[in-house]
Regions:
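Conserved mixed alpha/beta catalytic, RNA-binding, or beta-rich assembly cores of soluble enzyme
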Residues: 1-73, 77-117
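Charged phosphate-binding loop/patch that engages nucleotide di/tri-phosphates or the phosphate backbone
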Residues: 112-128
Length: 128
């Protein structure tokens, strides 16, 4: 499964002819309003609220629901999607690929493994 987090990342991956099975966007780029990436093949649209700097229970539940929905799935976040990379790495099946943008750096690609899940869980534990 390929999962993108972020409007620019999603837009760039789609422009390469790759359709992420799950796309998480918020209509923002570097905290500025932008048009959402175009994708006329979306089968399922889910929404959630997630304020900047937080990971809400609603977003976690929406991410979990996405993995049992018909792909391609787009999650539209009211707020900010940046930190949702973390619960995505926990919920994604092993061998999934999670892509997100690191501002002013480039694209980050995470191959989900048990080791990645353990590292992410430690980060989430510290955040709680």
């Amino acid at each position: 499964i390929i999962i993108t987090v972020g409007d620019k990342t999603t837009e760039n991956i789609i422009s390469l002819g790759i359709r992420p099975q799950i796309q998480i966007i918020d209509g923002l780029e570097k905290r500025n309003q932008r048009d959402i990436p175009l994708d006329d093949k979306i089968s399922t649209v889910l929404t959630c609220k997630n304020p900047p700097g937080e990971i809400t229970q609603e977003s976690i539940q929406t991410i979990q629901k996405a993995f049992s929905s018909d792909p391609p799935i787009r999650i539209i976040v009211d707020g900010e999607e940046d930190l949702l990379v973390l619960p995505v790495c926990i919920a994604a099946p092993e061998n999934s690929v999670v892509m997100y943008g690191q501002p002013n750096e480039g694209l980050v690609i995470v191959h989900v493994t048990p080791e990645i899940r353990a590292k992410v869980q430690k980060i989430l534990d510290v955040m709680n």
